[in-house]
């Protein structure tokens, strides 16, 4: 079955009860409505993909090139525009320009991958950023308790290797959490209740796609 996807907004976390009266932590995602603005095919573009637009925005805030893209599709401008790759041309044939996608593309119990931008933490040390254990708390350790330690020899190699884990800015990265279960689809309100936590802040843009590793499960 072809992978499905939709753009949405993370609203926050809450908890609900399942059929066994057990508490289930869920993230509430406002999913869609999305509108299809373009369909890419192997013959014309070299690959299969669908372009989705989501979110309200004043037309005066959209520049002319982007406005032209929306005009060609015959839809009003949206705040977010994203392209989702498809498996093949047959999957692309399931979409048409101007089509509207809502939360109903997913079913209760489906497994999804959720992509978002993680919260920014600012400049962080190695213990917080990479999980270093730090230096000893006693036995002669003085004012080095949270330092990373050696990052390389003076003469050999005489440089710091690329990729060495050091202090730096943490967060604000594109993160995907895989194999999350859709606990409930609220079609009336266009909301997905996804079991567990997803990346990003409340109000942030997320992409919800069918799980690539285990597929859908009704």
Swiss-Prot record:
Give the span(s) annotated as Disordered.
133-158
GO BP: any one term: translation
Instruction: Note the InterPro entries from the entry.
Output: Ribosomal_uL3 (IPR000597), Ribosomal_uL3_bac/org-type (IPR019927), Ribosomal_uL3_CS (IPR019926), Transl_B-barrel_sf (IPR009000)
Single GO MF descriptor? rRNA binding
Q: Which GO terms describe its cellular component?
A: cytosolic large ribosomal subunit
What domain of life is recorded for the organism?
Bacteria
The record's section on Pfam families has: Ribosomal_L3 (PF00297)
| HAMAP family associated with the record | Ribosomal_uL3_B (MF_01325_B)
Subunit structure, interactors included: Part of the 50S ribosomal subunit. Forms a cluster with proteins L14 and L19.
NCBIfam families per record: L3_bact
| Name listed for the protein in its UniProt record | Large ribosomal subunit protein uL3
- What is the gene name? rplC
């Amino acid at each position: 079955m072809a992978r499905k996807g939709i753009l949405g907004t993370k609203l926050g976390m809450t908890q609900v009860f399942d059929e066994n009266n057990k508490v289930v932590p869920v993230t509430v995602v406002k999913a869609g409505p999305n509108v299809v603005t373009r369909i890419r095919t192997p013959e014309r573009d070299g690959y299969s993909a669908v372009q989705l637009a989501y979110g309200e925005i004043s037309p005066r805030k959209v520049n002319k090139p982007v406005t032209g893209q929306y005009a060609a599709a015959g839809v009003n401008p949206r705040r977010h525009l994203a392209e989702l790759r498809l498996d093949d041309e047959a999957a692309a044939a399931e979409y048409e320009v101007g089509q509207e996608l809502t939360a109903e593309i997913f079913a209760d119990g489906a497994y999804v991958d959720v992509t978002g931008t993680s919260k920014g933490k600012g400049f962080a040390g190695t213990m917080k950023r990479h999980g270093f254990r730090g230096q000893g708390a006693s036995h002669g350790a003085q004012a080095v308790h949270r330092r990373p330690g050696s990052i390389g020899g003076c003469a050999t190699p005489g440089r710091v290797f690329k990729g060495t884990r050091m202090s730096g800015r943490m967060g604000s990265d594109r993160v995907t959490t895989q194999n999350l279960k859709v606990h409930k689809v609220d079609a009336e309100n266009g909301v997905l209740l996804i079991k567990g936590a997803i990346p990003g802040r409340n109000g942030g843009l997320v992409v919800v796609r069918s799980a690539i590793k285990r597929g859908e499960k009704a």
